[in-house]
């Protein structure tokens, strides 16, 4: 497990990170979200040793992260980092050989990974000849070719179409299933919500929320409920602690001041006739994000 504990970083008088603490668990995908300038890239660069922290600790399996550990890390920066005049597979093979693989093994790994990422027909093209989306896939291959123990990706889904997002997501899930700790940032909250096991939300250099996706949803549970019934529902608004809301796609939606008030609606609805659906509305990641950064 990768663990950050009370990590701080300042640039002059500006505090970029303020006692940042969170964990990236082995075998899990951790989504790292925040607005522009929130501190995501600074945090990642400190983990990778590109930037020095002012204080705090970064540990892997309980020990301080050393240079030897970082050789087992995979990193994809937000900026384009590949050599434009190299062929795609040649580039990935070169990087694999830097990690100690033989030319034969590096070629096998690069070929399999590029094919898995949908670049099988473009692996002999120059990097500069690829579309931005395909360059993004090639950068992901560069981060993955040595099968890293820790994988850190800064905006890996930027510029990808929905099909490419699905392909890349599948590759990341495979890496996590193999035991890697995977941390990725993204502004695409719907993609993060769909893919991640755990979430970290940062704003203004401070962690506003962290934990498993399901735990955060439960912690920030909505007071809104939806009810579908074959009978009239005008009576719902007359019950104590209930406010009828709009926006239900089927039936009626309402806000309940307490769970007991919501259960009173259900009991009354069942007394009046069959109920086909009664559910508490789950907050989206966008809902949670807006709530915690206020």
Question: Which residues make up each language-model segment?
Answer:
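C-terminal coupling/interaction segments
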Residues: 257-294
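Short, flexible helix/strand-to-coil boundary loops that buttress conserved ligand/catalytic motifs
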Residues: 69, 220, 293
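Conserved catalytic Walker-motif region of ABC-type ATPase nucleotide-binding domains
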Residues: 4-7
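Short alpha-helical
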Residues: 64, 83, 190, 234, ...
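ABC transporter nucleotide-binding domains
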Residues: 9-203, 209
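Structural motif
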Residues: 80, 240-243, 273
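ABC transporter nucleotide-binding domain
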Residues: 169-256
